[in-house]
């Protein structure tokens, strides 16, 4: 029992929501709400959707495994299953999505990966989910020479994120408002009003969802969601007859895709310190050098290297996304301050939240895999449909979790 993570039963006057941000997170929650009969106004400051962190030509959808079963592994496994099933359903319904479930090989390129491989091999997991391969089997599956064994995920693959986002929002219930920057939000008379750069109201609704990536803290004066920003750049390589033999995604410290739209996509850099958000030749060289270290024979087949896409991806200190309601910080500070004394949960009141305000973000580089499940859970929360089996995961993703940790340490949050 964790009353600070409990959600109320919502009673909405209208089933209309505003979502800020049309990357994969914003498009996913818009789609999930539309499936529940909501209308959605989706605000995007760029000229088109999926231009920032979701702007790569190709991105990977795959699980993330640990040597021993863990909460993190369970989350990524569940999210992977959800995303691949969602894609199968969308494609069966006629959606135009560039999804290539060609499989992924995570190379045993260092001691840590080798130890993980050995542990996974001993767990005898289902072969349609995971296989442990030696270097010969890896080379056969990849279609190119590999010096390493690998963990093979046959249902993984790569996708064009923009095509995924576009398919999600091609619903009559969703209205895209592009080239409009949401500068501020205000709440009055049970409505959230979103103001643009001129101060005008561009949309309003009882429910507002912040899905604006690195900018979510721009709209939450009373709470700061801890985020770690990382600049990542992907690179492109022109395919040749030799390089086009690659049949599946290769994972090492980065990733490499088979040829797609006359490019191999590989990368990505991981820079915690940066001054500008832009592609650079230096980052291309770093990506290329890393690829040469693990796949030298394949690299010898490639001639021309080009810059791909650079963007800031934000993750959280515990690497789990945020999916849930925005807490009332003053209420938490007043009613949960005694957590530092170790009082039992039964003595605390149910949590209080900012009315109708929700957040979905902090996906890092794995938003294509995890955003669907997180959006589904957030939609369940908004629609009073939380299943008992999902409660523990919702607690893990709760936007107030770092606030609670702060209060347990006896530190009161700054309240504006």
Task: State what each model feature region is.
Residues 15-42:
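N-terminal Rossmann-like FAD-binding beta1-loop-alpha1 element of flavoenzymes
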Residues 59-141:
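Dinucleotide-binding Rossmann-like beta1-alpha1 core, especially the glycine-rich loop
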Residues 65, 242-355:
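Active-site lid/adjacent beta-loop-alpha segment flanking the redox-cofactor pocket in flavoenzymes
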Residues 67-68, 96-106, 132-169, 269-274, ...:
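Helix-loop-beta segment of a Rossmann-like dinucleotide-binding subdomain
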């Amino acid at each position: 029992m964790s009353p600070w993570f409990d959600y109320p039963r919502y009673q909405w006057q209208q089933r209309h929501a505003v979502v800020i941000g049309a990357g994969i997170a914003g498009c996913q929650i818009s789609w999930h709400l539309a499936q529940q009969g909501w209308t959605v106004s989706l605000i995007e400051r760029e000229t088109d959707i999926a231009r920032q962190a979701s702007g790569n030509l190709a991105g990977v959808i795959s699980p993330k495994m640990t040597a021993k079963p863990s909460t993190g592994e369970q989350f990524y496994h569940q999210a992977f299953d959800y995303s691949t099933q969602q894609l199968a359903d969308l494609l069966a319904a006629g959606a135009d999505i560039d999804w290539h479930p060609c499989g992924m090989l995570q190379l045993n390129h260092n001691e840590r990966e080798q130890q993980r491989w050995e542990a996974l091999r001993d767990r005898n997991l289902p072969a349609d989910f995971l296989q442990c391969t030696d270097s010969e089997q890896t080379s056969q599956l990849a279609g190119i020479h590999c010096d390493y064994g690998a963990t093979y995920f046959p249902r993984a693959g790569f996708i064009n994120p923009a095509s995924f986002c576009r398919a999600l929002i091609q619903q009559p219930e969703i209205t895209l408002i592009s080239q409009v920057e949401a500068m501020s939000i205000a709440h009055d008379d049970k409505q959230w009003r979103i103001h643009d750069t001129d101060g005008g109201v561009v949309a309003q609704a009882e429910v507002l969802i912040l899905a604006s990536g690195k900018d979510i803290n721009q709209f939450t004066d009373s709470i700061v969601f801890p985020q770690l920003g990382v600049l990542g750049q992907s690179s492109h390589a022109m395919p040749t007859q030799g390089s086009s033999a690659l049949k599946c995604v290769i994972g090492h410290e980065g990733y490499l895709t088979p040829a797609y739209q006359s490019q191999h996509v590989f990368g990505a850099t991981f820079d915690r310190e940066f001054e500008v958000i832009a592609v650079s030749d230096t980052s291309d060289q770093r990506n290329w050098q890393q690829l040469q270290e693990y796949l030298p024979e394949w690299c010898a087949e490639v001639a021309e290297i080009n810059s791909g896409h650079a963007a800031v991806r934000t993750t959280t200190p515990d690497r789990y996304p945020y999916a849930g309601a925005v807490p009332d910080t003053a209420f938490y500070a007043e009613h949960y301050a005694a957590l530092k004394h170790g009082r039992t949960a039964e003595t605390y009141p149910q949590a209080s939240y900012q009315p109708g305000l929700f957040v979905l973000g902090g996906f890092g580089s794995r938003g294509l895999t995890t955003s669907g499940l997180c959006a589904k859970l957030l939609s369940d929360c908004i629609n009073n449909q939380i299943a008992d089996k999902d409660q523990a995961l919702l607690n893990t993703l709760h936007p107030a979790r770092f606030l609670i940790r702060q209060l347990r340490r006896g530190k009161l949050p700054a309240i504006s």
